[in-house]
């Protein structure tokens, strides 16, 4: 099994985890955005600490590294974790506020997923090369998400304040993918993920203390969705993303991660009693086709 294939499988698992967490997130919407994000991110970071300790005890490679290499990696973990954490806090909060300002859920999903377009566009500014087939996959994926989230809706496409929040959120998530792509090959992905969650959690909790008035009763009532999203969606999901992106092409990675919405629809059908329309099923098929097309080997790769 190649490293690229393993990375793609991990990204697919991440998309499944994030999609299934949609049901839990709906159950936790009674909490204000900074409160919800702060608690789930902090739990995600704390959940990774024992994982880091276990892997560190078993990892023999660290013993062979020089003191200078260890210091360099620690610095990279810290800088990368802080950078990713700040962007993650921004992106997740913008998304929550977009929904708070009553952006239609389907429209919000479509706008957010525009990060699959922003990744290659922003990547060009930092010297990233994108295979032509990826641009076609981005277009096919965008069409698929339209059918999945918006086709047949009476809401139209008028841009509201909430829509603007979600649009900026999509740009922030694209930046998050590119920043991870920059730092993850240079350090321990699990450690960097832990730092990013602790940073994002602290930032959101500070903003919560300034701008929100959280109810202890509401937090207690939502302990299960907070715990699920903190441990699985944040701790496991984002860590798999960080580790997988060591060997995955960032634009292809964003396409696989965009399957989150497909699995969110499936989870809604299985666990929340929701139903899928013909348009939604058609959108799922198109998106899967785009992702498969993006993973087909190039002529050079087939010859190797």
Predicted regions and their residues:
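Glycine-/small-residue-enriched transmembrane alpha-helix faces in small-molecule transporters
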Residues: 1-38, 86, 90, 94, ...
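C-terminal-most transmembrane helix of multi-pass membrane proteins
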Residues: 41, 53, 57, 222-224, ...
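Hydrophobic transmembrane alpha-helices of multi-pass small-molecule transport proteins
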Residues: 48, 130-151, 169, 173, ...
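Transmembrane alpha-helical segments that form core, pore/gating elements
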Residues: 45-48, 118-125, 138, 154-211, ...
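Helix-helix packing/entry segments at the starts of transmembrane helices
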Residues: 15, 39, 108-114, 180-201, ...
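Juxtamembrane helix-loop-helix junctions in multi-pass membrane proteins
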Residues: 16-46, 64-68, 103-107, 175-199
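Specific transmembrane alpha-helical segments of multi-pass solute transporters/efflux pumps
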Residues: 21, 53-111, 147, 230-248
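C-terminal transmembrane-helix exit sites in multi-pass transporters
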Residues: 47, 51-52, 115-139, 262-282
């Amino acid at each position: 099994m190649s490293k690229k294939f393993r990375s793609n499988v991990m990204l697919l698992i991440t998309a499944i985890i994030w999609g299934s967490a949609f049901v839990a997130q709906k159950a936790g919407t009674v909490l204000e955005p900074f409160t919800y994000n702060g608690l789930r991110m902090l739990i995600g970071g704390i959940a990774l600490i024992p994982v880091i300790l276990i892997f560190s005890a078993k990892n023999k490679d660290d013993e062979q590294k020089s003191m200078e290499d260890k210091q360099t990696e620690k610095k990279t973990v810290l800088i990368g974790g802080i950078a990713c954490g700040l962007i993650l806090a921004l992106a997740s909060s913008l998304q929550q506020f977009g929904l708070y300002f009553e952006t239609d859920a389907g429209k919000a999903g479509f706008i957010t997923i525009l990060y699959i377009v922003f990744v290659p566009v922003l990547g060009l500014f930092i010297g990233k090369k994108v295979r032509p087939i990826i641009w076609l996959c981005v277009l096919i994926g965008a069409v698929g998400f339209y059918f999945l989230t918006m086709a047949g809706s009476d809401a139209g496409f008028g841009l509201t304040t909430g829509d603007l929040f979600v649009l900026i959120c999509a740009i922030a998530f694209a930046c998050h993918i590119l920043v991870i792509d920059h730092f993850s090959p240079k350090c321990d992905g699990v450690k960097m993920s832990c730092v990013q969650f602790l940073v994002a959690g602290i930032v959101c909790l500070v903003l919560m203390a300034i701008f929100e008035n959280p109810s202890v009763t509401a937090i207690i009532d939502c302990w299960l969705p907070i715990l699920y999203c903190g441990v699985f969606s944040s701790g496991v999901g984002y860590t798999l993303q960080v580790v997988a992106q060591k060997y995955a092409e960032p634009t292809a990675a964003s396409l696989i991660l965009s399957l989150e919405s497909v699995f969110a629809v499936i989870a809604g059908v299985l666990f929340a009693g929701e139903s899928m329309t013909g348009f939604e099923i058609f959108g799922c098929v198109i998106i899967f086709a785009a992702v498969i097309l993006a993973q087909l080997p190039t002529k050079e790769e087939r010859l190797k």
